């Protein structure tokens, strides 16, 4: 279940990200190739032929030559590779070669968990992050009115019953945020909530 590419594109555009949004991609995302343009994308950790596994958001700010990688689970590089066989070194290298004179960029990656371990709302959390990015491109991860609606917990506590109320509250705030800003989400609210439910992945086990 989870979010389809069509849903994510519709919601992202209604959040005002349209001029900067490159689209949804599978793990073969080519990177950011326009050197002077603010840009962002939603990228799956798997190939499109698999139907997809987990959504991440990537964003490029040319002013500070920084690439932001938002993972709602806040997994380390090693865990992303271990769990999803996903590596982003290649796309970072391609982005650096295309976007900066000295081929150097800064990577800022989310390290905290905002999504429950059995939630299928990763794509929707990515939409929320991209709203933060286009409005506050120098501090999209935190210290802005959008992402400050969520409470992050250490990734090491992802499976802890102690943080379940916090992560469930995050998902409720996510839905509320989208309902206030996306007519598409409003129209399809019931179906989207069912497909991205907090315990969706547990139900599929």
Swiss-Prot record:
What is known about its induction? Answer: Expressed in the late phase of the viral replicative cycle.
- UniProt keyword list: Autocatalytic cleavage, Disulfide bond, DNA-binding, Host nucleus, Hydrolase, Late protein, Protease, Thiol protease, Virion
Query: Which InterPro entries does the entry mention?
Result: Papain-like_cys_pep_sf, Peptidase_C5
Q: How does it assemble?
A: Interacts with protease cofactor pVI-C; this interaction is necessary for protease activation.
**What is this protein's function?**
Cleaves viral precursor proteins (pTP, pIIIa, pVI, pVII, pVIII, and pX) inside newly assembled particles giving rise to mature virions. Protease complexed to its cofactor slides along the viral DNA to specifically locate and cleave the viral precursors. Mature virions have a weakened organization compared to the unmature virions, thereby facilitating subsequent uncoating. Without maturation, the particle lacks infectivity and is unable to uncoat. Late in adenovirus infection, in the cytoplasm, may participate in the cytoskeleton destruction. Cleaves host cell cytoskeletal keratins K7 and K18.
Similarity section: Belongs to the peptidase C5 family.
Record localization? Virion; Host nucleus
Residues carrying the site annotation Cleavage: 51-52
More info: All late proteins expressed from the major late promoter are produced by alternative splicing and alternative polyadenylation of the same gene giving rise to non-overlapping ORFs. A leader sequence is present in the N-terminus of all these mRNAs and is recognized by the viral shutoff protein to provide expression although conventional translation via ribosome scanning from the cap has been shut off in the host cell.
Q: Offer an example of a GO molecular function term for this protein.
A: cysteine-type endopeptidase activity
Look at the named UniProt entry and state the broad enzyme category this protein falls under.
Answer: hydrolase
Q: Which GO terms describe its cellular component?
A: host cell nucleus; virion component
Catalytic site positions: 54, 71, 122
Gene responsible for this protein: L3
Q: Write the protein's name.
A: Protease
- EC nos: 3.4.22.39
Q: What is its main location?
A: virion
Choose any GO biological process term that the UniProt entry carries and state it.
proteolysis
Question: According to the lineage, what is the superkingdom?
Answer: Viruses
* Pfam families reported in the protein's UniProt record: Peptidase_C5
Its catalytic activity? Cleaves proteins of the adenovirus and its host cell at two consensus sites: -Yaa-Xaa-Gly-Gly-|-Xaa- and -Yaa-Xaa-Gly-Xaa-|-Gly- (in which Yaa is Met, Ile or Leu, and Xaa is any amino acid)
Q: Which organism is it from?
A: Human adenovirus F serotype 40 (HAdV-40)
């Amino acid at each position: 279940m989870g979010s389809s590419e069509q849903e994510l594109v519709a919601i992202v555009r209604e959040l005002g990200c349209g001029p900067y949004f490159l689209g949804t991609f599978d793990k073969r995302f080519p990177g950011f190739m326009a050197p002077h343009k603010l840009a962002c994308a939603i990228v799956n950790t798997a190939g499109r032929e698999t139907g997809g596994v987990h959504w991440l958001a990537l964003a490029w700010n040319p002013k500070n030559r920084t690439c932001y990688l938002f993972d709602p689970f806040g997994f380390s590089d090693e865990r992303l590779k271990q769990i999803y066989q996903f590596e982003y070194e290649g796309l970072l290298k391609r982005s650096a070669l295309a976007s900066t004179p000295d081929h150097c960029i800064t990577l800022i990656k989310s390290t905290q968990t905002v999504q429950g371990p059995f939630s299928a709302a990763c794509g929707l959390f990515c939409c929320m992050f991209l709203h933060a990015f286009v409005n506050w491109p120098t501090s999209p991860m935190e210290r802005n009115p959008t992402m400050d609606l969520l409470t992050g917990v250490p990734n090491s506590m992802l499976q802890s019953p102690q943080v379940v109320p916090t992560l469930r509250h995050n998902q409720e705030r996510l839905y509320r945020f989208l309902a206030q800003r996306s007519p598409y989400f409003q129209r399809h609210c019931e179906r989207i909530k069912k497909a991205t439910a907090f315990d969706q992945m547990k139900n599929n086990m």
